[in-house]
C-alpha cells in the first residue's frame, strides 16, 4: 500500500510539473528594469498597450515593451515583463527565469561571453 501511495504521489508531482511547464510556454518572459523612460517604465494601468509585470498589479510600457509585444506576437506567445534590476538581468537570463532581455544592453566583450546578442 505504501508503494502504491508513493507511486501515485510521484506520478501526480510529475504531471503537475509538466502542467507548469506547459503554462509557462504560453508566455514570453521579458527582462527589463521598467524604469528607463522612454524605453521602458512602470505604470498602474494597461493603457496605451502596456504589458503586465509579473507578480505585481503594475504594467510596463515604452519602446522596449512595444518591441517585446511584436516579438511575442510573432512567436505566438503572450508577453510578460519580469521587472529585474540591471545587475540581475544576465543572471535571470542564464538561469531561465526570463527568456530574453530587452533593455538597451550594449554587447560588450564581457557580456558576449555569457549571453548572445541580436544584430
Each model region followed by its residue ranges:
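Short amphipathic alpha-helical "recognition" segments used for binding
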Residues: 6-7, 37
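Positively charged n-region of N-terminal signal peptides that target proteins for export
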Residues: 1-4
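Ligand-binding "clamshell"
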Residues: 97-98, 109-119
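Extracytoplasmic small-molecule ligand-binding "clamshell" domains
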Residues: 25-104
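Sec/Tat signal peptide C-region and signal peptidase I cleavage site
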Residues: 18-24
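Bacterial N-terminal signal peptides
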Residues: 7-18
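Short, flexible, glycine/charge-rich loop motifs used to bind or transfer phosphoryl groups or to couple energy/partner
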Residues: 20, 91, 117-118
Amino acid at each position: 500500500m505504501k508503494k502504491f501511495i508513493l507511486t501515485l504521489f510521484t506520478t501526480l508531482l510529475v504531471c503537475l510539473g509538466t502542467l507548469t511547464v506547459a503554462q509557462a510556454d504560453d508566455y514570453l518572459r521579458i527582462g527589463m528594469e521598467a524604469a528607463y523612460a522612454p524605453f521602458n517604465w512602470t505604470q498602474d494601468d494597461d493603457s496605451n498597450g502596456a504589458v503586465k509585470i509579473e507578480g505585481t498589479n503594475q504594467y510596463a510600457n515604452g519602446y522596449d515593451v512595444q518591441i517585446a509585444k511584436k516579438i511575442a506576437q510573432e512567436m505566438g506567445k503572450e508577453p510578460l515583463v519580469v521587472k529585474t534590476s540591471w545587475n540581475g538581468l544576465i543572471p535571470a537570463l542564464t538561469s531561465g527565469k526570463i527568456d530574453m532581455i530587452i533593455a538597451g544592453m550594449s554587447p560588450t566583450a564581457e557580456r558576449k561571453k555569457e549571453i548572445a546578442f541580436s544584430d
